Amino acid sequence: VALTKTDRVAAARVEEVRAEVEQTLRELGFDAVAFFPTAAAENIGIAELRSHLLQLAERPRPQQQRFRLALDRAFTVKGAGLVVTGTALSGEVRVGDTLWLTGVNTPMRVRGLHAQNQAVEQAHAGQRIALNIVGDAQKEAVHRGDWLLSSPPPEPAERVIVELQCHTPLSQWQPLHIHHAASHITGRVSLLEDNLAELVLDTPLWLADNDRLVLRDISARMTLAGARVVTLDPPRRGKRKPEYLQWLHALAAVGADDAPALELHLQRDAVRLE
């Protein structure tokens, strides 16, 4: 957290604001947060903040996973054709790769790549990417919220079990605005136990385990909660049975650790490998 313009106030005010922000973050579940008091005009704290951000950028990215990129823009360039942009959530992509474009449900070949405004031969998770793609799709058929994927996906999810991190308590079957990557839809929440809930989506989403979502009130004025995907397409009945809830709690606890998550899925049934 960067506290800006600290040269404009007394040191006591800086500490007061820091304590307020720290308390708010603690209530939201962020217990260990780095604070950087800064004053750009005086070059105070800038070097420390820059060093911290560079360290964050060097953290390992999920490049061994399948490539997933959420599209937020599509346009045409004279002499090149269709170009789409978005942020890669996982995996990596190279010029010449063939990716699956949802929405039009067709394969597209990557003819060119730009990452962070530079022409590159490959790009990876965490980067903003522009892809010049070639295939049986026109710009008018490509929409914000479509995905480029390394392989044809299973059907999008209409219902999903999530782990909630609430800023404001939610009520049973409350209507919500739901944000996921570049998608914005509506749906309802069915509370299960503790911080577990089922989201029933008005429009299916291309989700994966551990994806993050933002939940806002139906007037779209207030952010109510964050959510993390625990499992997709839950059973329509029996979600409140003790054994199923126990399984969900165990699955939520392992987070993004693939090996124990796979073991838990195998305890219940076969695993779909698409």
Would you name each region that the model predicts?
Residues 23-168:
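Conserved catalytic-core segments of large NTP-driven translation/proteostasis enzymes
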Residues 1-31:
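Conserved C-terminal guanine-recognition region of P-loop GTPase G domains, centered on the G4
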Residues 8-13, 23, 136-274:
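C-terminal effector modules of nucleic-acid-centric enzymes and ribosome-associated factors
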Residues 19, 51, 69, 260, ...:
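Short, contiguous clusters of charged residues that form electrostatic/catalytic patches at enzyme active sites
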Residues 11-15, 47-50, 83, 225-226:
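Short acidic, glycine/serine/threonine-rich loops at helix termini
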Residues 4-5, 89, 201:
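A secondary-structure boundary/capping signal
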